[in-house]
Swiss-Prot record:
PPR repeats lie at residues 319-353, 356-390. Residues 1-76 form a transit peptide. Binds to mitochondrial small subunit 15S rRNA. Regulates mitochondrial small subunit maturation by controlling 15S rRNA 5'-end processing. Localizes to the 5' precursor of the 15S rRNA in a position that is subsequently occupied by mS47 in the mature yeast mtSSU. Uses structure and sequence-specific RNA recognition, binding to a single-stranded region of the precursor and specifically recognizing bases -6 to -1. The exchange of Ccm1 for mS47 is coupled to the irreversible removal of precursor rRNA that is accompanied by conformational changes of the mitoribosomal proteins uS5m and mS26. Its main location: mitochondrion. GO terms for cellular component: mitochondrion. Belongs to the CCM1 family. Involved in mitochondrial-nuclear incompatibility, a major determinant in reproductive isolation between species, through hybrid incompatibility of Ccm1 and its interacting partner 15S rRNA between yeast species. Keywords: Mitochondrion, mRNA processing, mRNA splicing, Repeat, Transit peptide. PROSITE patterns: PPR. GO terms for biological process: mitochondria-nucleus signaling pathway; mRNA processing; RNA splicing. This is Mitochondrial 15S rRNA processing factor CCM1.
Length: 864
């Protein structure tokens, strides 16, 4: 038993080991704090005369060294204790020898501080070297020849960065030469991960150099290491389809290298030059990495290439993990039929290929997209029948499937409330089981609850959930923020605000109905859960004053219950603007007259320079579009401003029957492609007749009038300023597409606005001639045209213009597959007025135009 003595006297108290270690630990901590404080004071004084700045990374590195030293010291003492603890009780007091009692403590304390600091540094350094021995082989550390690089990039294993280490080895003299390739490659495969592409190329070159270019010696571990790093890469934004992708090309190059190695091996055997000790082999892990990256690129061609290559050449068929990756690819590409076929194949191949919970969760995600709740219930029953343990995500996905299915009365078979109630019960079951939750599960759980509350029209619960999630995320980011919180508010809010949460909140506003009661208020457990969230929602203040430097606030109305349409419209506008202006850190949606004139003056000069520099109209148009995109990213939170959230935001005044507000939102946040091209063309033709801005006197430009080199009428000047302001306002606008045109037609039906219907009919006709529409797949174009024609029939039916509705059907009967569900309302209206002739014509079109004929016609049109 080790003892500790306090003071230099002979008659002293003796403490057991645990208490002694506690005292020594406190003493070390105290000395460390004093040392750090002294160093900080020295650094502060030294900064007056030196330009050296201590970065937060350096401080973190030093603290990590101190923590590692403390842990190592504790382990050493613990090991010493375990060796000497035999035959002693933990609470016994051993006698102290006379030699120990006569030690002069004052003599020990007289050792200079510099020597103590030096000894402490030596201990820390030795502990650090021991730690490095477990991370990298000794020969690698010697060739890197920079312990700082190793420490800063590898010390924290959860955030290790091997790229600087590999790059440093690449420029070293020996690289990987004279290292045993077998043992080294085993360590390499299990350690070096998440390299960027250029570092992967460096690593591959060094591995080839190590084996003197003999591809036969390029073993399986080396292949797996390279493919693993390639599979973890992300494709570039401009090459999402995988066409001529550098990573795909590198993977194919490695497979060609492997084929060459097999060929050389076979030739050596035939020439009786000896069989190699170990021939490299392709593995399932390599195939999975190839498929993983191919799915990221959304490249069906490359995925099919790798599956065929491994199956035919290497005898490796996709396993459970590979097939799950394929299903996930089909899910992202909206190829649900192929996903279901692959899933059924997995169930009937063998027990090794039978789907696991990850595969089932993927299929549940497809059920959510298809709003197929019967199939989701069958899948959940299969999970239970095969004794597969559901995960947290399984219950969450079931709730989301039921929520999305309840949004449509036809899909839900008239049982929307029952589906939402069942969705909440799955979440109650998840809470009762207390399953493990990943950090991403919290987001998915909130999204599931937001979906159920939004489709139920429960605004109070949706507001509470939105507030609680955004507040939690905001405070977490601020607590872990390394920079200046007040200065970096723009970045913090950009990371905090989420488009999915905003979309569900807007959906709750759109489904507002003060007469409906929430589903959760119908049973005790639901009442308790709802009351819990509403109690945590601070509806009056929404302000956190615990930290005076950080104030969190959302622009909700200071009332707990919204009970009027005006309140819903006002709050939805406030929340929408708050998200687009990035938490109020930007001022984009409102501007004074002076600011507007400044913007016009600024962008007139910019557009002038574009027109003079461009060789033709297309180049000028490209420059303007690029500038608009850049301007939008600088002034709007593009993460939340998308077509899905805008569609939901525009649907709020439609459902609340507020025509004026709908038209205001539509005009302010959307633009049309043909109008944009007309404005661009006018500006280009006008600027080509104006000298470059460098030849004009800059002082002649004022906020009241902008002089040009040729006489301009007031009408011309107003038109130019209008066009420039149109371009400036595009920063908060999204181009109208087929979905938004359908929404406008639904608004015309709801408001019975014939002028709006005619306008959207003409505007969509012009949109059909633009490049964005013509680039769409032809089957999609036909489906979109059919949907819009159906809405036109609904509009004329509500207007009582039955002959116009029938005319649309007859003019498109050879193009569209008109079903009875599409003309049901028209048929009922004709029956009511007893127009037998029109009913006969209508039913003749519906009955004769079978689905098979429609497909045949589409096939003929595609061939043409």
């Amino acid at each position: 038993m080790y003892m500790a003595r306090c003071g230099p006297k002979n008659n002293v108290l003796c403490f057991p080991f645990q208490l002694s270690f506690l005292f020594s630990k406190r003493l070390i901590n105290k000395r460390f704090k004093y040392t750090l404080q002294t160093e900080d004071e020295k650094n502060m004084m030294g900064s007056l005369s030196k330009n050296k700045i201590i970065t937060p990374e350096d401080v973190e590195f030093k603290l990590a060294q101190l923590r590692e030293f403390s842990n190592t010291l504790k382990e050493r003492i613990h090991n010493t204790k375990s060796v000497n603890s035999d035959g002693h009780q933990s609470n016994s007091i051993a006698p102290i020898s006379e030699d120990s009692r006569n030690v002069n403590v004052t003599k020990i304390s007289s050792v200079p501080n510099e020597e103590k600091s030096k000894n402490l540094s030596d201990l820390i350094h030795s502990s650090f070297l021991e730690k490095m021995d477990h991370l990298v082989p000794k020969v690698i550390r010697e060739r890197v020849a920079d312990d700082d690089i190793l420490a800063k990039n590898l010390f924290d294993r959860s955030h290790s960065n091997w790229a600087p280490v590999i790059d440093r080895l690449y420029v070293s003299e020996k690289r990987f030469m004279d290292i045993d390739s077998r043992e080294f490659s085993v360590w390499l495969n299990g350690t070096v991960k998440y390299l960027p592409f250029h570092s992967i190329l460096h690593l591959d070159e060094m591995l080839l150099e190590q084996i003197n270019g003999d591809v036969v010696k390029f073993n399986t571990h080396m292949y797996e290491c390279i493919f693993n790093n390639l599979g973890n890469l992300k494709p570039t934004n401009f090459n999402q389809d995988g066409t001529n992708d550098k990573v795909i090309l590198k993977m194919k190059e490695l497979l060609e290298r492997y084929d060459k190695a097999l060929k050389i091996t076979e030739e050596r055997i035939n020439k009786k030059e000896g069989f190699p000790s170990k021939v490299p082999k392709m593995t399932q892990a390599i195939l999975n990495n190839c498929l993983k990256y191919s799915t990221k690129c959304s490249s069906f061609h490359d995925m099919d290439y790798f599956i065929t290559k491994f199956r035919d050449d290497y005898g490796i068929t996709p396993n459970k993990q590979n097939l799950t990756t394929v299903i996930q690819f089909y899910s992202r590409k909206e190829m649900t039929k192929q996903a279901w076929n692959t899933f059924d194949t997995m169930k009937f191949l063998s027990t090794k290929h039978f789907p696991d919970i990850c595969t089932y969760n993927t299929m549940l995600r497809i059920c959510e997209k298809e709003r197929n709740f019967p199939k989701a219930l069958d899948l959940f029953q299969e999970i239970q029948d095969h004794n597969i343990k559901p995960t947290t995500n399984t219950y969450i996905m079931m709730a989301r499937v039921l929520a999305s299915s309840s949004s449509n009365a036809v899909v839900s078979e008239g049982k929307s409330d029952s589906l939402r109630l069942l969705g909440w019960k799955y979440l109650h079951e998840l809470e009762d089981k207390n399953l493990y939750r990943h950090k991403k599960d919290d987001l998915n759980l909130f999204l599931a609850m937001m979906a159920l509350a939004a489709f139920d029209g429960d605004i109070e619960l949706s507001r509470a959930l939105y507030y609680l999630f955004i507040a939690k995320k905001y405070k977490t980011l601020c607590a872990n923020w390394k920079g200046n919180i007040l200065v970096d508010q723009d970045t913090i809010w950009k990371s905090t605000l989420m488009p999915e949460m905003l979309n569900y909140l807007m959906l709750a506003y759109a489904r507002f109905d003060p007469r409906n009661l929430p589903v959760l208020s119908g049973y005790e457990k639901g009442i308790e859960l709802r009351r819990k969230f509403l109690r945590e929602f601070d509806s009056s203040m929404r302000l956190d004053d615990t930290d005076k430097l950080v104030k969190f606030k959302l622009p909700f109305l200071p009332i707990s219950d919204l009970n009027s349409e005006a309140q819903v419209l006002a709050e939805s506008n406030a929340i929408w603007s708050f998200n687009l202006e990035n938490g109020g850190t930007r001022n984009t949606l409102t501007s004074s007259n002076e600011a507007a004139l400044e913007d016009i003056k600024k962008y007139r000069q910019l557009l002038d320079s574009f027109a003079q520099e461009a060789e033709d109209f297309n180049e000028f148009k490209f420059k303007v579009m690029y500038e608009v995109t850049k301007m939008q990213r600088e002034s709007i939170n593009v993460n939340v401003f998308n077509k899905i959230s805008l569609h939901t935001y525009l649907s709020i005044p439609i459902n609340l029957k507020q025509q004026k507000e709908f038209l205001r939102r539509l005009t302010f946040f959307t633009f049309q492609q043909h109008e944009f091209e007309a404005v661009i063309k006018r500006l280009y033709e006008g600027y080509r007749n104006i000298p470059s801005s460098h030849t004009r006197d800059q002082n002649s430009i004022s906020t009241e009038a902008i002089s040009v080199s040729k006489p301009e009428t007031t009408e011309d000047l107003n038109l130019i300023m209008h066009d420039i302001w149109y371009i400036t306002c595009l920063r908060h606008k999204i181009m109208m597409d087929t979905t938004l045109y359908e929404l406008v037609m639904k608004a015309a039906i709801e408001f019975q606005n014939e002028d709006l219907a005619k306008k959207v009919w003409n505007d969509r006709g012009k949109f059909r001639t633009t490049v964005p529409f013509l680039k769409m797949d032809q089957r999609i174009r036909i489906a979109k045209d059919q949907k819009f024609a159906h809405l036109m029939v609904e509009f004329f039916t509500k207007q009582g213009k039955y002959s116009d509705a029938i005319a649309i059907i007859l003019s498109s009967k050879n193009r569209f597959n008109w079903t009875y569900s599409m003309v049901r309302n028209l048929h009922k209206a004709l029956e009511e007025i007893e127009d037998r002739n029109s009913v006969e014509i209508l039913l003749d079109v519906v009955n004769k135009k079978s689905h098979a004929k429609a497909l045949k016609w589409e096939e003929q049109e595609l061939n043409m």
